[in-house]
Amino acid sequence: MPFGHTFDRLGSVKYFTWDDAKNEKLKADRGIGFEEIVFLIGQGHVLDILEHPNQQRYGGQRIFVIQRDNYVYLVPFVEDDRLIALKTIIASRKATKQYLEREPDDHET
């Protein structure tokens, strides 16, 4: 079911969609749902967009890297001319370390 929208680089409207049953399961199991992901995207909390590393199995999928508070979530998605279909939400300790826990510079004390 589409919820919310965003604009691509050319100004075209894109609608978000997802599986409602999957969304309810994510909220129950992980404490976060697709509605919040769409809100965070709209608020500029996208740290990166990656190609899915397993294109053979998940061809065409990309991954939003989203910051929520002090943690990073990976959100696989597929996109066409008018829809962005969100697939799941994965809390990632590895991505949190990579994107949010920067190494201090040598000149910092």
At which residue positions do the language-model features occur?
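Ribonuclease/tRNase effector modules and their secretory precursors
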Residues: M1-T109
